[in-house]
Amino acid sequence: MSKYAGIVLAGGMSSRFGEPKALASWQGSTFIEHILKVMTSTLQEVVVISHSDIKEPVEKLVQVPVIEDIPHYKGNGPLAGIVSGMEYIEADWYAIMPCDAPNVSHEWFTILLGQTSNEYDAVVPIINGRKQPLLAAYHNRVKEKIYALLQEEKRSMVQLLSQCNVKYIAGEDVQANADWFINVNTKEEYVQAQKDLSNE
């Protein structure tokens, strides 16, 4: 069993973006390829949770397993994706990553996983005053909490955090690198993110 594993969430419909965000161009590759390059440099095992519509093109791009949600919970948002990844890879801790934050650095995973300890269920960053539960790490024991929520048809990450002993991290090394956590949800944000990158 790995101590640490990674789960990339690429199951959303990307309705605001207008096309699958996982396949959007970024620095000569795609969002999903860039994120996986960063994650696999730090983590022993990584799995991509994909929407069925893009599973095949994603598989052609990446060298890690690409799976869909557990059938019974398909379409139940990020909780379904996270628990599907937890079932696929056995690990103590799971670093979660959405497919629409392409600016992430391998340094982030070193910081995040360095904050894990057995007394916590989750480690979650606070960026510009906002909790970021999809850029976080979760202990294996959280799996049962997720199943319980899904059985009650609850899908909220906030509801999950309310049931966990969470270590929130908001130190200078996180705040000074807020651009690591930028989510690209619209074409306007995509254009701005590319401009910001070219200005660095």
UniProtKB/Swiss-Prot annotation:
GTP binds at residues 9-11, 21, 69, 100. Its EC number is 2.7.7.77. Signal peptide: none annotated. Pfam families: NTP_transf_3. It is found in: Cytoplasm. Keywords: Cytoplasm, GTP-binding, Magnesium, Metal-binding, Molybdenum cofactor biosynthesis, Nucleotide-binding, Transferase. One of its GO terms (cellular component) is cytoplasm. One of its GO terms (molecular function) is metal ion binding. Its cofactor is Mg(2+). InterPro entries: MobA-like_NTP_Trfase, Molybde_CF_guanTrfase, Nucleotide-diphossugar_trans. The keyword Ribosomal protein does not apply. GO terms for biological process: Mo-molybdopterin cofactor biosynthetic process. Coiled coil: none annotated. Belongs to the MobA family. This is Probable molybdenum cofactor guanylyltransferase.
